[in-house]
From Swiss-Prot:
<feature type="zinc finger region" description="PHD-type 2">
    <location>
        <begin position="1203"/>
        <end position="1257"/>
    </location>
</feature>
<comment type="similarity">
    <text>Belongs to the JARID1 histone demethylase family.</text>
</comment>
<dbReference type="GO" id="GO:0034647">
    <property type="term" value="F:histone H3K4me/H3K4me2/H3K4me3 demethylase activity"/>
</dbReference>
<dbReference type="InterPro" id="IPR013083">
    <property type="entry name" value="Znf_RING/FYVE/PHD"/>
</dbReference>
<feature type="binding site">
    <location>
        <position position="514"/>
    </location>
    <ligand>
        <name>Fe cation</name>
    </ligand>
</feature>
<keyword id="KW-0175">Coiled coil</keyword>
<dbReference type="Pfam" id="PF01388">
    <property type="entry name" value="ARID"/>
</dbReference>
<dbReference type="GO" id="GO:0000785">
    <property type="term" value="C:chromatin"/>
</dbReference>
<dbReference type="GO" id="GO:0008340">
    <property type="term" value="P:determination of adult lifespan"/>
</dbReference>
<keyword id="KW-0408">Iron</keyword>
<feature type="coiled-coil region">
    <location>
        <begin position="874"/>
        <end position="926"/>
    </location>
</feature>
<dbReference type="GO" id="GO:0006355">
    <property type="term" value="P:regulation of DNA-templated transcription"/>
</dbReference>
<dbReference type="InterPro" id="IPR004198">
    <property type="entry name" value="Znf_C5HC2"/>
</dbReference>
<keyword id="KW-0479">Metal-binding</keyword>
<keyword id="KW-0805">Transcription regulation</keyword>
<dbReference type="InterPro" id="IPR048615">
    <property type="entry name" value="KDM5_C-hel"/>
</dbReference>
<dbReference type="GO" id="GO:0003677">
    <property type="term" value="F:DNA binding"/>
</dbReference>
Length: 1477
């Protein structure tokens, strides 16, 4: 960020560039052979493999700290200044509104050509252009030499090589051109030798074209021509750039007509710091690049008379002579400069180089060539753009450009690293040059500020917010003029320093290396957009930076002494860091500030579109830096932006308003000025300047451009030396450059103040600093006392300085440093003494141990003893602590020496005590090694003591033990202690022997596994048992074979195997008689398949045959029992019903379609829960008993539900005329269209209907079922289930027939007959013998049913069978057209509970304890998958089965609360609660 004075300026045309033909030829010089190396290629790695510098610190001020920018910057300065550039992230509540209308904001950006700004590239291009310029205007025909391969010779590289060999003169004298050629040519061409033609080519071209140019430069450097220097400095002053825009246009009073000058064309600029006033050019001067009308001979005789010359007798050419030989002879060889107004002439033989003939083209004298040379390269890389943009259109352009460049759809897809790498590649790219646009240096007074300003008219809904931020201290329009900013004493704004500039950036737009004007601070705020990347060098390293750049580009730095004050040169930070320059980076996001410190070189670029604003400010600590900057500017003859001394005296004038900090700094500077003025007066006296030659002048009333030293360009304020005759002015220091033709007597000394005036000002200002001086004297005395002061007293002085707002002087910082150092040491000591923080944890994977050691503690004690404050108390504590540490170390050393006498626990306790000290103790590491050795010994003994036990195979963990593989043992051996003892050596030997033995047995196991046999398994295992600790492939296979065989035996006899014998054949012969389920047989078969010995054996085939027989039996039974539209599997059909309890409770139990292929595992899966026939018999009898108790409750629940008991759950609404059927067993009512006809119903009286729950199967004839059992294994439990059902059917049929006969004879009641009939109807096998009696009793007992639903039954019978049965019945998810919550889906009431019973054989029914806990007067003892309970909430808190109370779940859930009958008897008032117990 650069600066300009806020003054009037006008738009100006583009700056004149160097002549086009040299630039065109220069481009040829760039197309050299790819094989020819250069300095650029030497530095290539830094550009193509860019490494980002380390990041500078980021600061996050609190809201309180953020309230005062100057104070906060002063607070962080001592830490941050060394980085040059730092970032400040404001508090989250700092959100200034953007005050610019993006559509109305218009600007014309500058175009930046990235490959023209880099220092190394620029140096080469400049050299080539200057060389062409010199040869062209010197009258030489210049062409680029070409080698034999057609490659253009790189003249810049050739020049550098010759210079490295000592220069042209030395190369010529020592005949080193072959060496030069050898250095120039690439290695692959050197194989063919160095061509003599090439040597002659480069020698002749160098001597003819390059050496005269170099000689001209040396002669110019040796000259001490002040007039010429003025001319050069003036020209460069015109072309000072900020991002390529003109820095200033200051006109120095002309003492003479500049030779070789021209009309000054002002450079295009956004705004100017100063404007030249009343500038007049010589009327006789022509435009640069035009030539006078002369004939080809350039003879004096042919020179036309000047226009308007009335003297016909005098030829103007008589005044022309050769400036080299001062003679006018040989007029036909006397050349005259083509620049109008320049009368310099030179003979062809006086030229350097000598011309053989009069050149046909343009010729200029050396002075005019030098003038043209000074312009070359000043404006490279920065050009005026043709298009004007507003913020919206530039945003669109910038984002599209970035997306197109990186080939993405959105700018957010491009990583930050990719942009940075591409930028540094582009600055050296010749093949694909990149140009971008940058809206830089846009003055806010003209285009507007991104911050609201006090003078703006604020409107809109955010009016108050704008007014708030218009006065905010961090508003960049306010920062330069804050009370503690030195710049606040200026009466007028300085553009870029006091008046902010704004910058509209895009991807790759760059700002080159520079420092701020007058080395002030700068602050930059990114209003919105993508990041701005900064690189910074601290002010203390500025000279390192300058030296590095001189090394990188000596041609540029040697040519421009003030190169570092321009903003047109880029240099790679990675390269600079390799040369020892400390550079750090800052990544500035939107909404963040960046601060640059005095003399901090900084540069950077933009990652994409953004809008930033910047301004300078100058805290009081800047004053001394500003003075140093003026001296630096003087050395390079750079113009000032303002007079530093003048600013200081503006502060002196306002001394009554200065704070103590500013008063002190101003007083110190004023004393320096006073002493300097005294010294200058003494110098003048020695020079002979008398008092009569002295004059008091008010310099501030003289325009800046009229009071600058003609030599160093410093704006003068305190004093000046003036030549009365020629009106020239210098500072006193440069009196010898004032005038070459006058003496001291012709000088006049002008001064601003008398010495007495300065002395009085010092006294007056000193009075304002009395309190500080007293504070300083007292603090000095305190530090110089014999006894050291206590830390508390030092803090009192610091607090006093803070309260009185004393400046951050060296004394204050000294006290703060003492306090900080002391507190830091105290904190370290306290961490050791009080164990507040454990800095290293006990983890296996440790980071680097950064803790101190005992030497570090002793060093800390010594540091505390040497400090400038008294820390005796803490030092004494630390010394006593060290004594304890030494005592511990002695104990630790004893434990290490006699480790055998210490247990592992004792050593661990010593380590734990040592860890508590939290310092590095080498004894801890030694103790840990002892622990490691003991741990290793324990691990090794675990292996060596692992012995096989007689019954180890019976251990339930036998299969899952963690054993050791060969690699584990080898690893254990490798981990053995490096310094073994006798004990560890013995363990290593044992491990090695065990491993050898185990590997031998592994071979035996391998042989067995190749030909496994069951009769050999026992003997093989006996030989392998001792390797129980070993885990290898073939021993594992034998071990697992043992385990599988044991499991198979266990499955067969349900006993824990004793593996000393294997009598499997006997067991397998019994398997057909063993009680076993089909699923268990399949499990045994699977186990056989995993056994190497039994898979495919005779025994295995026998089991497979049994399974095949059972599967065939299942198929036969399924054909007999399962209808096509079955909703029950075989077990559910053949077993007693277990769904009665939930049905009695009113629950909905869905049935799912069971049709399709018969899978035995699906048909008998409930059989997995039974392990014996006794369990099945007990289970079936229990269900039968429960059916007798509960079935009446089921009928009651179904009757109450009506059609909700239908398989559609009552959702299939119908007319009252629709036919329904009622099951004669369970009283559930069904729509006819919801029912399916069963052939069994044809055997019953017409109108008789059994529902799908009561008629689960096809009711096959008992003889068919008996036949199906033929050939089945006697021990298969599934066959027992069928046999039991056959036996039950016979008994029920016998009971039915006997009851019917006895009823006829009067010996039996109707109730007994009804029970017998119910049993017969519920039996799933049909015994035809009982059918007549059953039909007779049905017709009699259910006559009403039969008459009522005979037509409905006929309708069902005649209805065609559905082609596609329903997927499920009684399923609310399927049948409901609109979802209605069912009882089973309601949230269980707080007064009810459900006790789940797992369906294991022993827990399938309720325990007696459960029955006893039900307090119903007649408990029905229900059981099943779920039984619901309800609790009395009246006071007794007793529990009851819901079914035992006669309620359904819906009724229970609808109750407010349930009260039992006992509690109701004691109630005093009626209640709505229900009780039926």
């Amino acid at each position: 960020m650069r600066a300009r004075r806020q003054e009037n300026s006008i738009s100006t045309p583009s700056a004149p560039s160097t002549s086009t033909s040299p630039r065109k030829k220069a481009s040829i010089g760039n197309s050299r052979s790819k094989n020819h190396g250069s300095k650029m290629e030497m530095y290539d790695q830094f550009y193509k493999k860019f490494v980002r510098p380390p990041m500078a610190p980021i600061y996050y001020p609190t809201e309180e700290e953020f309230s005062d920018p100057i104070e906060y910057v002063a607070k962080i300065r001592h830490e941050a200044e060394k980085f040059g550039v730092v970032k400040i992230v404001p508090p989250a509540n700092f959100k200034p509104p953007f005050a610019i209308d993006k559509e109305a904001f218009t600007f014309r950006p500058r175009t930046q050509k990235l490959n023209e700004v880099e220092a190394i590239v620029k140096e080469k291009h400049t050299f080539i252009d200057r060389l062409i310029n010199f040869n062209r205007y010197s009258g030489l025909t210049f062409e680029f030499p070409v080698d034999r391969d057609g490659n253009i010779v790189d003249l810049y590289r050739l020049h550098r090589i010759v210079q490295n060999f000592g220069g042209c003169e030395e190369v010529n004298e020592d005949e080193k051109w072959r060496d030069v050629a050898r250095e120039y040519l690439p290695k692959e061409q050197m194989a063919r030798g160095v061509p003599s033609a090439f040597i002659n080519l480069i020698r002749s071209h160098y001597n003819l074209h390059i050496e005269p140019f170099n000689r001209n430069l040396k002669e110019k450097a040796m000259k001490n021509d002040d007039e010429s220097d003025d001319e050069m400095e003036e020209l460069k002053h015109k072309y000072q750039h900020h991002h390529g825009t003109m820095r200033t246009e200051i006109e120095v009073p002309n003492d003479k007509t500049t030779e070789g000058g021209e009309d000054e064309c002002p450079v295009s600029m956004q705004s100017g710091r100063r404007r030249s006033k009343n500038k007049k050019a010589s009327s006789s001067r022509k435009t640069l690049g035009t030539s006078s009308k002369k004939n080809s001979t350039r003879g004096r005789k042919n020179k036309k008379k000047a226009e308007g010359d009335d003297d016909d007798d005098e030829d103007p050419m008589d005044q022309v002579f050769c400036v080299a030989c001062n003679e006018g002879k040989d007029e036909d060889l006397l050349l005259l400069c083509d620049i109008d107004g320049c009368n310099n002439g030179r003979h062809t033989y006086c030229c350097d180089p000598v011309l053989d003939e009069v050149p046909e083209g343009e010729w200029r004298c050396p002075k005019c060539i030098e003038s043209e040379d000074a312009k070359i390269g000043l404006d490279w890389g920065f050009y005026d753009a043709d298009t004007e943009y507003n913020l919206n259109s530039f945003t669109e352009f910038a984002n599209k450009w970035k997306c197109d460049y990186f080939g993405v759809k959105d700018v957010s897809q491009v990583s930050c690293d990719a942009v940075e790498r591409s930028f540094w590649k582009n600055v050296i790219s010749h093949e694909n040059p990149v140009s971008v646009k940058y809206g830089a240096d846009l003055i806010t007074s003209r285009v507007g500020s991104g911050f609201p300003r006090k003078e703006d008219k604020h409107t809109g809904p955010d009016l108050k917010l704008k007014q708030q931020y218009a006065s905010h201290a961090w508003n960049l329009n306010n920062m330069p003029v804050l009370r503690e900013s030195v710049l606040s004493h200026f009466n007028t704004g300085i553009s870029g320093m006091m008046v902010p500039w704004v910058y509209v950036g895009m991807c790759f737009s760059t700002f080159c290396w520079h420092t701020e004007d007058h080395w002030t601070y700068s602050v930059n705020y990114n209003h919105f957009g993508e990041r701005k990347i900064w690189y910074g060098v601290g002010g203390e390293d500025a000279e390192k930076f300058e030296d590095a750049l001189k090394k990188i580009a000596p041609g540029l730095t040697g040519r421009q002494r003030d190169l570092f004050h321009h903003m047109t040169t880029a240099a790679n930070p990675h390269l600079l860091r390799s040369l020892g320059v400390p550079i750090h980076s800052v990544h500035q996001n939107a909404g963040e500030f960046v601060i640059t410190f005095p003399r901090a070189y900084h540069a950077g670029f933009n990652e994409g579109l953004n809008f930033a604003e910047a301004v300078n400010f100058a805290p009081i600590d800047w004053l001394s830096k500003g003075r140093e900057c003026v001296e630096s500017y003087s050395n390079v003859r750079r113009y000032l932006v303002f007079s530093h001394d003048e600013l200081l005296f503006k502060m002196v004038e306002a001394m009554d308003k200065l704070g103590i900090s500013m008063s002190l700094a101003t007083h110190e500077e004023l004393i320096r000025i006073y002493e300097k003025q005294k010294m200058l007066r003494e110098l003048l006296a020695r020079l002979g300047v008398s008092n009569r030659q002295m004059q008091q002048v008010m310099f501030e009333k003289i325009p800046d451009e009229q009071r600058s030293c003609r030599f160093c360009k410093t704006t003068l304020f305190m004093c000046a030396l003036v030549c009365n005759k020629h009106k020239k002015m210098t500072c006193v220091e440069h009196h010898d450059h004032l005038c070459n033709s006058c003496t001291t007597k012709d000088y006049r000394y002008q001064y601003r103040f008398e010495l007495d005036q300065l002395n009085n000002m010092c006294d007056e200002l000193g009075k304002r600093t009395v309190n500080y001086n007293g504070w300083k004297e007292e603090s000095d005395e305190m530090l110089e006392e014999e006894g050291k002061p206590k830390l508390e007293r030092i803090e009192e002085f610091i607090d006093s300085a803070k309260q009185n707002k004393y400046p951050q002087t060296d004394q204050v910082h000294k006290l703060i440093t003492i306090r900080h150092t002391a507190k830091s040491a105290i904190e370290k000591a306290n961490q050791l003494l009080f164990k507040k923080v454990r800095t290293r944890t006990k983890t296996r994977c440790q980071r680097a141990d950064t803790r101190t050691d005992t030497e570090g503690v002793r060093s800390l004690i010594e540091q505390m003893q040497a400090m400038d404050c008294n820390l005796t108390v803490i030092i004494d504590k630390l010394e006593k602590w060290m004594e304890q540490v030494e005592m511990w170390r002695n104990r630790a050393k004893d434990a290490i020496y006699r480790e055998q006498e210490y247990s592992k626990e004792e050593i661990e306790k010593i380590i734990e005590e040592g860890d508590e000290y939290d310092i590095k103790l080498e004894e801890i590491d030694e103790l840990r090694k002892v622990i490691q050795m003991k741990d290793w010994s324990d691990r090794a003994r675990k292996v060596t003591t692992w012995k096989a036990t007689p019954d180890m195979e019976k251990d339930i963990d036998f299969e899952y033990k963690l054993r050791y593989a060969s690699s584990d043992i080898l690893s254990l051996i490798r981990d053995s202690p490096r310094n073994p003892t006798d004990g560890t050596s013995k363990l290593v030997f044992e491990l090695q022997q065990m491993l050898r033995d185990a590997n031998t047995l592994e071979v035996i196991a391998n042989n067995f596994c190749e030909n496994p046999a069951l009769d050999q398994l026992q003997s093989i295992w006996q030989s392998l048992r001792e390797t129980d600790w070993f885990y290898e492939k073939y021993i594992n296979m034998v071990r697992y074979e043992i385990i599988h065989v044991a499991k198979i035996k266990s499955m067969i006899d349900a006993a824990i195997p004793v593996l000393s014998e294997f009598d499997l054949k006997t067991q397998l012969q019994k398997i057909v008689n063993v009680e076993i389920t089909l699923s268990k047989a399949a499990e045994i078969s699977k186990a056989f398949e995993t056994s190497k010995c039994l898979n495919g054996s005779e025994e295995h085939l026998g089991i497979l045959d049994m399974i095949s027989t059972m599967n065939a039996f299942t198929q036969r039974i399924a054909i007999l029992f399962k209808p096509n539209n079955a909703y029950h599997n075989l077990f559910e059909i053949l077993s007693e019903r277990d769904d009665l309890t939930p049905l009695a409770e009113g629950q909905t139990i869905p049935l799912y379609f069971q049709g399709g292929a018969v899978h035995p595992s699906d048909e008998w899966h409930q059989m997995k829960e039974f392990e014996s026939l006794d369990q099945i018999v007990h289970h079936q009898s229990s269900l039968r008993e429960m059916q007798m108790r509960i079935f009446e409750k089921v009928k009651q629940a179904n009757s109450a539900r009506g059609l909700e008991a239908c398989s559609c759950l009552g959702f299939n609404k119908s007319d009252d005329s629709e036919s329904t059927l009622t099951c004669i067993m369970c009283d559930s009512e069904f729509h006819v269209r919801c029912c399916e006809w069963s052939p069994f119903l044809e055997k019953l009286p017409e109108g008789c209907f059994l529902c799908v729950r009561c008629l689960r199967g096809q009711r096959p004839v008992i003889d068919d079922v008996t036949t199906a059992l033929n050939g089945t294994p006697s021990g298969c439990l599934e066959t027992h289930l069928v046999r039991n059902l056959i036996q039950k059917t016979r008994g029920i049929t016998q009971n039915l027939m006997e009851a019917a006969n006895k009823r006829k004879s009067g010996e039996s009641s109707d109730d007994i007959c009804k029970i017998a009939l119910f049993d017969w109807l519920s039996c799933e096998i049909l015994n035809p013998n009982g059918l007549p009696k059953a039909r007779e009793l049905i017709s009699e007992f259910y006559m009403e049913y039969l008459q009522k639903q005979s037509s409905a039954a006929l309708e069902l019978k005649n209805r065609p069978v559905r082609s596609k049965p329903s997927v499920s019945l009684f399923d609310p998810k399927i049948t409901a057209k609109r979802k209605r919550p069912s009882v089973s889906h309601k949230e269980t009431s707080k007064k009810s509970r459900k006790r789940q019973s797992q369906a294991s054989p022993s827990e399938y029914y309720e325990d007696e304890s459960e029955f006893k806990s039900c307090q119903a007067r007649a408990c029905l003892k229900p059981y099943g998958d779920s039984v619901n309970w309800v609790m009395c909430e009246a006071g007794c808190k007793n529990w009851f089965h819901v079914i035992c109370l006669g309620f359904t779940l819906r009724e229970i859930n609808d109750m407010h609360e349930y009260r039992c009958s006992s509690c109701l008897d004691h109630a005093d008032s009626p209640t709505s609660s229900v009780s039926t117990d």
